[in-house]
Amino acid sequence: MARPVTLCTLQWGDLPLDVICEKAKSFGFDGVELGLPSHLDVRQTDPEYYRNIKVTLDKYGLQLFCISNHLVGQAICDNIDQRHKSVLPDYIWGDGDPDGVHLRAVENMIQAAHAARMLGVDTVVGFTGSSIWQWLYYFPPVTDEMVNEGYADFARRFIPILDEYQKLGVRFALEVHPTEIAFDTYSARKALEAIDYHPAFGFNYDPSHLGYQGVDYVDFISQFPDRIFHVHMKDVYWSDTPKQIGVFGGHSTFGDARRFWNFRSLGRGKI
């Protein structure tokens, strides 16, 4: 069955909504996935604000199926530091005090659910962040208790958000991705277990974040058929031979030819 193909606007945050919609239509897309904060301010409560967005989409014959709140979501469970200032809006970063950043990020994620309702969509795609990503490699030794506390922290922060989403009939789709509480099949299962399989929580499936890790990205679909709420289509290449920079990335930038893996456009990778 053919499905609509939409353009996620996050990478075009420097362009006004009207411009990116015009381009998306000319590129042949069926719709857009509106990215926060550049193309949607979920703090707005005036229905006219959301009507104007719909008018813009209708002007170009574009559909809307979900909105994205990745950057703010990252600040919910992360241990906040100076890196976050570069990706967070000023109204989330504030004075940079971690407790304040966490609280404002949670509030904004709940506002995103209300915005989704105003726009007539039922899915918010985003990140969660993770208090335990820094312990990915088990040296110095990482205990089960430390890891379990990380998942408990995720549950404490996200269950109240998910409860609000459920009341509104909106779902949260975590993009399974490095630096999030779920970054492969095993951690995705642990995340679901931590929140007792909350009905408002599922996944945004992007196999490009799984393949280079050695994760069976087809099996992921089989494991969570009812929890995949949205899909991102992106490709990734990983080398058939050893490289100078391994799977961890070697503190190099994306695109470096010495890397074992790099993201690529559809059809130019190995997915």
Residue ranges and their predicted role:
Residues 34-58, 73, 128-135:
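Glycine-rich, proline-tolerant flexible connector loops at the mouths of alpha/beta enzymes
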